[in-house]
């Protein structure tokens, strides 16, 4: 995932992004939700 894509929404979705970057063990469903939230 590109950081440039996330930057604009990093503060809005900080909890989800923290989970993504710290654990890096998201399920496919969580990944889809994160993608939908950003886009």
Swiss-Prot record:
Q: Name one GO molecular function term.
A: metal ion binding
> Looking at the record's lineage, which domain of life comes first?
Bacteria
- What EC numbers are recorded for this enzyme? 2.4.2.18
What is the catalytic activity of this protein? N-(5-phospho-beta-D-ribosyl)anthranilate + diphosphate = 5-phospho-alpha-D-ribose 1-diphosphate + anthranilate
Instruction: List the pathway annotation.
Output: Amino-acid biosynthesis; L-tryptophan biosynthesis; L-tryptophan from chorismate: step 2/5
| Bilayer-spanning residue ranges | none
Keywords, sorted A to Z: Amino-acid biosynthesis, Aromatic amino acid biosynthesis, Glycosyltransferase, Magnesium, Metal-binding, Transferase, Tryptophan biosynthesis
Q: Which Gene3D superfamilies match?
A: Transferase, Pyrimidine Nucleoside Phosphorylase, Chain C (1.20.970.10)
A single BP term in Gene Ontology? L-tryptophan biosynthetic process
Please describe what this protein does: Catalyzes the transfer of the phosphoribosyl group of 5-phosphorylribose-1-pyrophosphate (PRPP) to anthranilate to yield N-(5'-phosphoribosyl)-anthranilate (PRA).
Q: Give the family per the record.
A: Belongs to the anthranilate phosphoribosyltransferase family.
Q: How does it assemble?
A: Homodimer.
Task: Quote the protein name from its UniProt record.
Answer: Anthranilate phosphoribosyltransferase
Organism taxonomic ancestry: Bacteria, Pseudomonadati, Pseudomonadota, Gammaproteobacteria, Enterobacterales
């Amino acid at each position: 995932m590109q950081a440039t894509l996330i930057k604009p929404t990093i503060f809005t979705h900080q909890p989800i992004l923290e989970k993504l970057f710290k654990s890096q063990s998201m399920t496919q469903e969580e990944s889809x939700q994160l993608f939908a939230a950003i886009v």
